[in-house]
């Protein structure tokens, strides 16, 4: 499956989750957030526009039910940094996931996720460069 997404943030600040960095105010979008391009970075700085190109694959057809892979490249531009040039950021996201198909651990999933984020120097007050690798283990509990 292929994904193409566009997202635009507008207002007096980026989306601040209660407070945006040190700006201390809720932007004109209120307190609701629905973002298409949210991985490590949410790509929601002041005036930011972002594009995502992604790909996901289910390996069931290759005889490995429960295994999937997702990739995304997200590029954000037009970050208002209060100067003559706008800032930018980009992220590469990878995730490998396996869901146990049967037995006592049925529906348990293990995800290996990596992200590589790069932010232009003039937007460093908004976000920082970084690399991360995370492992998630989700074990659903069926109570009722």
Residue ranges and their predicted role:
Residues 1-65:
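Extracellular/periplasmic loop regions
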Residues 38-42, 79-84, 120-125:
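Extracellular loop and loop/strand-boundary signature of outer-membrane beta-barrel proteins
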Residues 47-51, 86-92, 127-133:
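Residues that define the transmembrane beta-barrel architecture of outer-membrane proteins
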Residues 60-67, 101-110, 142-144:
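Short loop/turn motifs that connect adjacent beta-strands in outer-membrane beta-barrel proteins
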Residues 66-95:
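C-terminal/domain-terminus segments
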């Amino acid at each position: 499956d292929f994904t193409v997404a566009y997202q635009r943030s507008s207002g007096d600040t980026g989306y601040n989750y209660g407070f945006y960095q040190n700006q201390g105010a809720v932007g004109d979008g209120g307190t609701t957030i629905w973002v298409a391009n949210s991985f490590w970075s949410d790509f929601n700085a002041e005036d930011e526009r972002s594009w995502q190109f992604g790909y996901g694959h289910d390996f069931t057809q290759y005889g490995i039910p429960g295994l999937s892979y997702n990739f995304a490249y997200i590029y954000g531009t037009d970050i208002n940094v209060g100067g003559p040039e706008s800032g930018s950021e980009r992220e590469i996201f990878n995730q490998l996931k396996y869901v146990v198909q049967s037995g006592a651990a049925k529906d348990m999933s293990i995800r290996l996720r990596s992200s590589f984020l790069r932010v232009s120097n003039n937007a460093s007050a908004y976000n920082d460069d970084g690399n991360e690798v995370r492992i998630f283990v989700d074990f659903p509990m069926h109570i009722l």
